Amino acid sequence: MSDILYTVNGITRTNDQQGKGASRRLRKQNLVPAIIYGGNEEPTAIAIKKNELWKLLENEAFFSNILTINLEGEEHLAVIKDLQRHPSKGFAMHADFQRIVKGQKINMQIPLHFTGREEAPGIKAGGILSTLVTDIEIVCLPSNLPEFLEVDVSNLEIGESLHLTDIKLPEGVVIFELDVDEPVDRTVVNMQAPTVEEVDTDAEEVDAADVPATEQGSEEDKGE
């Protein structure tokens, strides 16, 4: 885990600032309602300045790093676990943060970064790299939390693929789907053959209506 890069400044919400109606009023004041839970403590309802949170959300690493949440001088270590956005405008409407407890493992969604694309034999042969998974759930101690996982595709030939078990993991990190009773080794990325553009047969077919009619049965016509 890298040093803590992001600090979220919030205020504790009072009882009359909680609930759907109160949340709407907070948003009108350019505040985003949020909650911090976990860590053997009671959940704490908070509010965060909309513009400040918006800037933080622009960074991919914000979603996979341990954060400092500053509540009126009291600091909490946490990770973001859920974010609700406006369905059409995209701005944050509510955020959930989970407290970090030293020595206690956490589940986190981590982005995958694909490297070596230009060096891949399949790309050089005209193939198409198709990424099927862009992030995965991992389990680890907070001290081992990676910002992202790297997937090297530099050796992929056309027709080949990489699975979850092919991802190199840092020490102390496991993939949740592979650490269960019935693991599922999903395909993460594959190299597809170049698509051959189908010939537009309709365009090549001659429209009978556009062809001048030929004299048919000319012999019969002559006999009439």
Swiss-Prot record:
Disulfide bonds: none annotated. GO terms for biological process: translation. It comes from the Bacteria. GO terms for molecular function: 5S rRNA binding; structural constituent of ribosome. Belongs to the bacterial ribosomal protein bL25 family. CTC subfamily. Part of the 50S ribosomal subunit; part of the 5S rRNA/L5/L18/L25 subcomplex. Contacts the 5S rRNA. Binds to the 5S rRNA independently of L5 and L18. This is Large ribosomal subunit protein bL25. It comes from Psychrobacter sp. (strain PRwf-1). The gene is rplY.
